[in-house]
Amino acid sequence: MSTLFIADLHLSVQEPAITAGFLHFIQREAIHADALYILGDLFESWIGDDDPEPLYRQVAAALKSLQQQGVPCYFIHGNRDFLLGKRFAEESGMVLLPEENVVELYGRKILILHGDTLCTDDTDYQHFRKKVHNPLIQKLFLWIPLRLRLRIAAYMRNKSQQNNSGKSERIMDVNSKAVIDAFLRHDVSWMIHGHTHRPAIHSVELPMVTAHRVVLGAWHVEGSMVKVTADNVELITFPF
């Protein structure tokens, strides 16, 4: 018995090898799991559930097949696909979770999240995040014609890449205090997240206990998953 976690696949039509790797992962690994959790940035971008891109239908069909075979799939939004909504969730069979969620697995309480909210030193990003998560702004954006949304999304991606190229590695990583606060706020000793693309298992000293923060890797040249069983929590890389 095991539960699997993945994040930061950044699926797009420009990277067919990653999509193929994800579909193989569904057929080879996820099908045998108790559940699959996707912790954000499944897609490189998401401009609305009404986007007819065939890639999205392909991914939805694979996830729906997984659900129909008895493996539930849960999703937490990332900074790239935060507009993914109920329509796609229903099409794919995924259950949408809040941005911070505690799951109990095999005797462990684990906090799961995308991870961008932990990067509090990146104040420019946090200000931007607050704006784009405003329900009114999201509603207005989704009201814009699809073709214009595509152009806006492309512009924002380019701008983000330019901004990040000038930021220090420290600023774009998690803030230690934010991590400790999250552990204490949810009263857990395990955390799994993505976003930073820095796969590792970190020990975090809390009052009376040593906690563990597990960071998923991005799917660039290989896959990354966390496998939780009754006996262990493993961070695993694998070829596509």
Curated annotation (Swiss-Prot):
Topology of this chain in the membrane: Peripheral membrane protein
Catalytic class of the enzyme: hydrolase
Localization, UniProt: Cell inner membrane
Keyword Cell cycle in record: no
Binding residue positions for Mn(2+) 1: 8, 10, 41, 197
Entry superkingdom: Bacteria
Keyword tags: Cell inner membrane, Cell membrane, Hydrolase, Lipid A biosynthesis, Lipid biosynthesis, Lipid metabolism, Manganese, Membrane, Metal-binding
UniProt remark on cofactor binding: Binds 2 Mn(2+) ions per subunit in a binuclear metal center.
Coiled-coil segments: none
Protein name: UDP-2,3-diacylglucosamine hydrolase
Organism: Yersinia pestis
Record lineage: Bacteria, Pseudomonadati, Pseudomonadota, Gammaproteobacteria, Enterobacterales
